[in-house]
UniProtKB/Swiss-Prot annotation:
Name of the protein in its database record: Pyridoxal phosphate homeostasis protein
Annotated CDD domains: PLPDE_III_Yggs_like
Coiled-coil segments on the chain, per record: none
Organism: Pasteurella multocida (strain Pm70)
Pfam families: Ala_racemase_N
Protein family: Belongs to the pyridoxal phosphate-binding protein YggS/PROSC family.
InterPro entries reported in the protein's UniProt record: Ala_racemase_N, PLP-binding_barrel, PyrdxlP_homeostasis
Record PTM N6-(pyridoxal phosphate)lysine, positions in chain: K35
């Protein structure tokens, strides 16, 4: 199957899940995870109508952003990997979204380093919803403190929450994590009524339907669009 065919199939799957959940047709946005994929693949996806892409590695992402900017192709770029403080400047300068914010130190650096001529950097707070030692993200009870600190930073725009639950085939376990995330998302909206809290980024290729059922507004799909990743490059 081509990238275009894969995208069409995924959009169909998203619409089916949205209908099953009795949610509006435009409720869920697709983020194409393009890490380790060449610009030719991204261009194919763009030609098929996909405009939002997620990258996990700073340097690789910046090179792709610059490539498409030079061609005047207007794509939306999301950073979705763990971010070390020595790499914040590149994310602040080049990306449109940063989905994995989990420390005030990183928020402060992104705010200071975001060019003033650009719109504020859209950010999501990453929650470690499955309480895994190996995962980035903050504990749920730390969410509101960090959110209020971000609200005071003029060059960041807090848009919501992101999570990567522990992988499992058990639907009940999937839904438990996603339901908890949706509850936190609603808490955040109530705590900050004047903020633009509209994005709950959760759900990947294998658990997308559960995530949409539980209120996800953005699913992050890579392999099902682009095929298996080649990490040797």
């Amino acid at each position: 199957m081509t990238i275009e065919q894969n995208l069409a199939q995924i959009q169909q799957n998203i619409q089916h899940a949205v209908q099953q959940a009795k949610r509006p047709e435009s409720a869920v946005k697709l983020l194409a995870v393009s890490k380790t994929k060449p610009v030719e693949d991204i261009y194919q996806a763009y030609q098929a109508g996909q405009t939002a892409f997620g990258e996990n590695y700073v340097q690789e992402g910046v090179e792709k952003i610059q490539y498409f900017a030079q061609k005047n192709i207007p794509l939306e770029w999301h950073f979705i990997g763990p971010l070390q403080s020595n790499k914040t400047k590149l994310v602040a300068e080049h990306f449109d979204w940063m989905q994995t914010l989990d420390r005030k130190k990183i928020a402060d650096r992104l705010n200071e380093q975001r060019p003033h001529y650009k719109k504020p950097l859209n950010v999501l707070i990453q929650i470690n919803i499955s309480d895994e030692d190996s995962k980035s993200g903050i504990q749920p009870n730390e969410m509101l403190d960090l959110a209020k600190q971000i609200q005071n930073l003029p060059h960041l725009c807090l848009r919501g929450l992101m999570a990567i639950p522990a992988p499992t085939d058990d639907l009940a376990t999937q839904e438990q994590a996603f339901t908890q995330m949706h509850s936190l998302f609603e808490q955040l909206k109530q705590a900050l009524p004047d903020a633009q809290i509209d994005t709950l980024s959760m759900g990947m290729t294998d658990d997308m339907a559960s995530a949409i059922q539980c209120g996800s507004t953005m699913v992050r799909i890579g392999t099902a669009i682009f095929g298996a990743r080649d990490y040797s490059k």
